[in-house]
Regions:
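Histidine-centered phosphotransfer motif of kinases
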Residues: 85, 89-97
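Membrane-anchoring alpha-helices and their flanking helix-loop junctions
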Residues: 1-84, 98-174
């Protein structure tokens, strides 16, 4: 983990708040064990199990791809470079995608409404964290906006529901 590019105090505080919230939700998902509220259909449980395994693999490969540039903070590191190959050709945020798959897999396995609510909270938080990080990446790397327009944020699906990366003021093509 390396030093981050200079960020103003407000931006750094928001970055740390996002990391703290992510950590709190993940810990809550892992340690809270409410009584089951429902019994998921077998097919859903099996799909969730496969998604969890795939998510763990996706997360690890994303971390390995970043190497020394890996950081929990949604800010570019000083020695980093824009990664657009490998897993990052399929998804702009493979680590977040892996966390989402693991979180939802865990929540379905717990079969509790509270766990599903935590997975939904993790989804909303990682969406916000990705948007925050993308703004910083667009300011740092001239080619980021073009990369973001052709690469899905999370899921490497063959279709796009809508343009997922709005043009940022001052973020030119590179």
């Amino acid at each position: 983990m390396g030093l981050h590019l200079s960020a103003n105090r407000g931006e750094a505080a928001r970055a740390w708040a996002l990391v703290a919230a992510q950590f709190a939700i993940l810990v809550a998902l892992l340690v809270w064990s409410p009584a089951p509220d429902f019994r998921p259909p077998r097919w859903l449980q099996r799909a969730a199990d496969y998604a969890g395994v795939a998510g763990a693999l996706w997360l690890v490969l994303g971390l390995v791809s970043l190497g020394r540039s890996a950081t929990a903070l949604p800010l570019p590191v000083a020695h980093g470079r824009l990664r657009t190959g490998g897993l990052y050709r399929l998804s702009r945020h493979p680590i977040y995608t892996g966390l989402l798959a693991l979180g939802w897999s865990w929540a379905v396995g717990a079969a509790a409404y509270g766990s599903l609510a935590l997975a939904a909270a993790l989804t909303a938080l990682l969406w916000a964290k990705a948007r925050f990080e993308e703004a910083a990446l667009a300011r740092t790397y001239p080619g980021y906006v073009d990369y973001a327009e052709r690469t899905p944020r999370f899921l490497p699906l063959g279709f796009r529901l809508r343009r997922s990366f709005p043009r940022l003021p001052g973020a030119g093509r590179g």
